[in-house]
């Protein structure tokens, strides 16, 4: 006698113990639904299977073959003689970019079909469980009502998920795949073909000719991220404490003045600062007029000066954000602890060290991690302020103040080295993801949340 089938029964057991229509549903999708008079649902499953196999033969197999080879015939020109006249004609060839994209799209299409196939098996199992328990098999209208009520959220997510697959997952996988090809300025598509080269691009970045650029930029990127995050966090808290000092007059006015920088678009502030700090800008002109300097200070043209200038300008932009968050936290701190500490004779510094700062850090720890990762990928400050300059002849397609993310941009737009840019993108993600996980799981915010 066959065992009872439930909605959680493993599919291997369902195939072994199931009825003939359930077993055949593993080969012919929707058969169990058709046998149980769910004609609409069964036909949809069956048509999905037929459409997949037709597409598999006509489109998917050639697309997967093209993704493996990335093309065999280059586009070019040939001489053709017509009525004794030699003409130059274009020779059609393969496009490695399109072959890779179509191949990846075919894999995603196969994954979607695999999910539909799994839904077919779950439906067959559910029908058998209903029949064994003596319950009524719902028709299509009743199934649709269930979808519109209990699983309405799944229906709403269908179109967004398709959009995510097409416009997020597919480009992301495409970018990752480029890291394993030789798609660079020597192999410009579609004119030339590029090939799979394995991990050679990673070796070129980490050990080859690019290592002399990658590791100095990685070091500067981490220094910048730490300095930018720490300065805006510390001085933002200090400013918030000053603005919340008892007896300070015109608090709202002072707070508004500091928040004005937030109202100005960031790129506008950065471009203004770029003009303000250049060799012939207002600041250097003022310093020379006052005879404080003999010549212009290279705020943006000397590597060391430029790095300090970037950090200070970022403080100007970032401190007000931290000040606002810290102000909200300080205004909602329990006053009982602070008053008790004051009665016990604690100084303001001791109160800040033992009460105020720990509670601010507890609340802002996730935000700090986010700011650090954001600064690793802070494209705007570098691009609009220095453009990555000043130039450095020892670097490949990078300047002295370039971050990894701005270097990635130059490798893509200027150098056309898409494979190397893809490698840099993967390494940036690995660094950011590793730090985020390690920092967050060790933060007090995570430990307190996990303890609840």
Language model regions located:
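Intrinsically disordered, low-complexity coil segments
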Residues: 72-89, 190-191, 391-398
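A compact, surface-exposed functional segment
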Residues: 45, 49-77, 359-360
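A structural signal for multi-pass alpha-helical bundles of membrane permease subunits
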Residues: 59-67, 121, 152-452
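N-terminal signal-anchor/first transmembrane alpha helix
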Residues: 2-14, 19-21, 27-35, 39-42, ...
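Membrane-interface segments at the starts/ends of alpha-helical transmembrane spans
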Residues: 76-108, 207-219, 298, 303, ...
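Glutamate identity and glutamate-enriched acidic tracts
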Residues: 17, 49, 74-77, 81, ...
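Helix-loop-helix
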Residues: 70, 75, 84, 136, ...
């Amino acid at each position: 006698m066959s065992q009872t089938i439930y909605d959680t029964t493993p599919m291997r057991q369902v195939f072994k113990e199931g009825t003939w229509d359930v077993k055949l549903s593993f080969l012919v999708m929707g058969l169990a639904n058709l046998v149980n008079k769910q004609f609409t649902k069964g036909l949809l499953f069956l048509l999905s299977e037929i459409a997949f196999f037709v597409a598999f033969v006509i489109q998917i197999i050639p697309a997967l073959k093209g993704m493996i080879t990335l093309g065999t015939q280059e586009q070019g020109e040939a001489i053709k003689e017509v009525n004794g006249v030699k003409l130059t004609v274009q020779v059609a060839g393969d496009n490695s970019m399109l072959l890779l994209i179509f191949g990846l799209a075919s894999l995603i299409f196969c994954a979607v079909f695999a999910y539909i196939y799994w839904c077919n098996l779950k439906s067959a199992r559910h029908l058998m469980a209903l029949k064994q328990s003596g319950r009524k098999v719902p028709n299509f209208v009743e199934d649709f009502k269930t979808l519109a009520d209990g699983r309405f959220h799944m229906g709403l997510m269908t179109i967004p998920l398709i959009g995510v697959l097409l416009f997020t997952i597919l480009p992301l996988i495409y970018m990752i795949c480029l890291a394993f090809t030789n798609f660079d300025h020597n192999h410009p598509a579609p004119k030339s073909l590029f090939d799979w080269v394995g991990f050679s691009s990673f070796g070129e970045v980490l050990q080859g000719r690019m290592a002399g650029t990658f590791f100095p930029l990685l070091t500067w990127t981490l220094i910048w991220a730490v300095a930018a995050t720490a300065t805006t966090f510390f001085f933002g808290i200090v400013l918030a404490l000053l603005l919340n000092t008892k007896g300070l007059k015109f608090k709202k006015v002072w707070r508004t003045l500091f928040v004005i920088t937030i109202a100005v678009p960031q790129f506008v502030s950065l471009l203004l600062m770029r003009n303000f700090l250049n060799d012939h800008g207002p600041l250097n002109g003022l310093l020379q007029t006052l005879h404080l300097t003999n010549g212009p200070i290279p705020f943006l043209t000397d590597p060391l000066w430029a790095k300090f200038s970037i950090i200070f300008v970022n403080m100007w932009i970032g401190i007000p954000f931290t000040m606002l968050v810290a102000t909200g936290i300080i205004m909602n701190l329990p006053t009982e602890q602070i008053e008790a500490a004051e009665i016990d004779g604690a100084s303001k510094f001791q109160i800040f060290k033992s009460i105020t700062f720990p509670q601010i850090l507890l609340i802002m720890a996730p935000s700090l991690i986010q700011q650090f990762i954001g600064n690793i990928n802070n494209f705007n400050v570098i691009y609009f302020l220095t453009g990555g300059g000043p130039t450095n002849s020892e670097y490949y397609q990078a300047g002295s103040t370039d971050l990894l993310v701005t270097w990635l941009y130059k490798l893509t737009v200027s150098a056309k080295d898409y494979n190397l840019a893809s490698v840099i993108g993967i390494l940036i993600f690995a660094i950011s993801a590793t730090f985020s996980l390690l920092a967050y799981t060790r933060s007090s915010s995570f430990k307190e949340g996990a303890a609840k």
